[in-house]
Amino acid sequence: MQSFEKEFLKPRSINIEKISEIHSKITLEPLERGFGHTLGNALRRILLSSMPGCAITEVEIEGVLHEYGTKEGVREDVLEILLNLKTLAINMYVKDSIVLTLKKTGIGPVIASDIEYDSSIISIVNPNHIICCITDQDTSIIMRIKVQRGRGYVPAFSRFSSDDQHDLPIGRLLLDACYSPVERISYTVEAARVEKRTDLDKLIIDMETNGTIDPEEAIRRAATILSDQLSSFIDLKDVHQPEVKEEKPEFDPSLLNLVDDLELTVRSANCLKAESIHYIGDLVQKTEVELLKTPNLGKKSLTEIKDVLASRGLSLGMRLDNWPPKHLSEQ
């Protein structure tokens, strides 16, 4: 008998239209009715929120104390410089975090390729990207730029505790990090036909990236993430937690208490100790006849002992298996 999942159509045609290096259209058809929106929306959300990438998270500009200032001899203010830095497309191959240096002197644009870096560790996809423009021949600009790997969108101050925020050195400028390499994605669902069936879906995904990843590779990664998350449901079973049975104590805890806890008269207590009756468990195993044979213990003391035991729900002549417990016998 054919399993039910094989009754569903799978895309027979996957067409990739490469509009540019960073822009592609991917078409999948045919899909069962409704699956176009189901898959399209799931992939879109993953591509926008969960794709790993690299972003600039911290910047220090020599001579600048805060983001609302300006740099003499530079056309852009600090806020505009930071916005330009945020749009740098960077790939990091080895490390999860690295600090880069930028130094430039003299009139002219400061571009991404002016950043000093090891090409075996990172690459800058848009090296001609303008960061700022120097308008004075004697002006120098020196920056320290921290690049980190991550995913999604992370606000600047969420990366630090409240105590760490107060300890940040003056002049360190924090940036909100958008790690996702996907800049724009949309999908549409059109009608598809297979033989006589006309109620099928065609899914068209239109996507642009920042150039650090091919659109096709981004789709593959998103599909892998989705598949991995759904794999937990494939072998879904109703797992019952094993019933934990409370272990009943081998003996009534009160039997492990010393005879002194009964607060007997001094005469009765001394008679019991003389017979090596130290625990209540030792006492309740004795019969009335055995106790009356104890030197200096008369009927009055016996009655006292019986009354005290009865007030605790105990009596003489009780049978206790495995007495004394191991930890008492070792004492």
Swiss-Prot record:
GO terms for molecular function: DNA binding; DNA-directed RNA polymerase activity; protein dimerization activity. Pfam families: RNA_pol_A_bac, RNA_pol_A_CTD, RNA_pol_L. One of its GO terms (cellular component) is DNA-directed RNA polymerase complex. It is an enzyme of class 2 (transferase). Belongs to the RNA polymerase alpha chain family. Homodimer. The RNAP catalytic core consists of 2 alpha, 1 beta, 1 beta' and 1 omega subunit. When a sigma factor is associated with the core the holoenzyme is formed, which can initiate transcription. This is DNA-directed RNA polymerase subunit alpha. The lineage of its organism: Bacteria, Pseudomonadati, Pseudomonadota, Gammaproteobacteria, Enterobacterales. The gene is rpoA.
